[in-house]
């Protein structure tokens, strides 16, 4: 409970509000909805992924690091934002891949639901192999940023690798 710690609550609310605002999560969702049923260009697809999944995971990393031992270190927070963005882009690429390549039974939810809804996905735009390469690239970026942050982050490193290798 941080109700008696406005010095912590105010920055956390600011981080989350920035991630959720019209220039981030809300804007990305709007573009995602507008792109349904069409083939988006590279800039639109990037905007959607950066401002939805990327922004959300960027905020999560920044808030977690802010509350940690190195929370006052702006350099660490910058690395955390970069880590979160890379992780978000890797996660989104894997999500698109899994939706396109796994069965309903394997996923535990409807497979190919993105295609059925006419969603703008990396697979629809780039194809399976290039999307897989993007997932690997962004995962390596995230691992690099996590290692640079340092500290007791073995769980984070394992989580990043798990997200690349997940099956659902």
Regions found by a protein language model. Name each.
Residues 1-168:
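All-alpha prenyltransferase/terpene-synthase fold signal
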